[in-house]
């Protein structure tokens, strides 16, 4: 029997504790879980991808079956095929997230019918945490320590120094 390989993608700009929770839970479902940092052309970048990757690798270092990869200008299904992933993992906070994700699921299935999407619901304590909300708090100098992993906080502090 072949290994179960999953792919969880996002812009992770920045990664939140909600992302971390979904990744930790998804890692228990697969032999190998890739976490793909994707550049979203519709979003203004806050942290450079290199900083995001470094922060994610530190935050996920305790998960032996998880590997962080970065991708520019590729479709998720193409990355999944390249990595041998047959499952896409998506986190859902609310009905709006499901509606948004369903359209991508449709196209992904059209492009590769052997790739399935698995949805994991956010835990109640993470329902209202979003990367855009964290960026907004940062814009106004607010403390975000309770919303992001320590390694991400370090990357943000280091980026602000430069």
UniProtKB/Swiss-Prot annotation:
Pfam families, per database record: CTP_transf_like
Major localization class: cytoplasm
This protein's pathway: Cofactor biosynthesis; coenzyme A biosynthesis; CoA from (R)-pantothenate: step 4/5
Reactions performed catalytically: (R)-4'-phosphopantetheine + ATP + H(+) = 3'-dephospho-CoA + diphosphate
Enzyme Commission (EC) number: 2.7.7.3
Binding site for ATP: 11-12, 19, 91-93, 101, 126-132
Enzyme class per UniProt: transferase
One Gene Ontology CC term in the entry: cytoplasm
UniProt binding sites for substrate: 11, 43, 76, 90
InterPro entries: Cyt_trans-like (IPR004821), PPAT (IPR001980), Rossmann-like_a/b/a_fold (IPR014729)
Cofactor: Mg(2+)
An MF annotation (GO) of this entry: ATP binding
Domain of life of the native organism: Bacteria
Keywords assigned: ATP-binding, Coenzyme A biosynthesis, Cytoplasm, Magnesium, Nucleotide-binding, Nucleotidyltransferase, Transferase
PANTHER family named among the record's database cross-references: PHOSPHOPANTETHEINE ADENYLYLTRANSFERASE
Quaternary data: Homohexamer.
Family: Belongs to the bacterial CoaD family.
HAMAP family for this protein: PPAT_bact
Stated role: Reversibly transfers an adenylyl group from ATP to 4'-phosphopantetheine, yielding dephospho-CoA (dPCoA) and pyrophosphate.
Name the UniProt record assigns to this protein: Phosphopantetheine adenylyltransferase
Gene: coaD
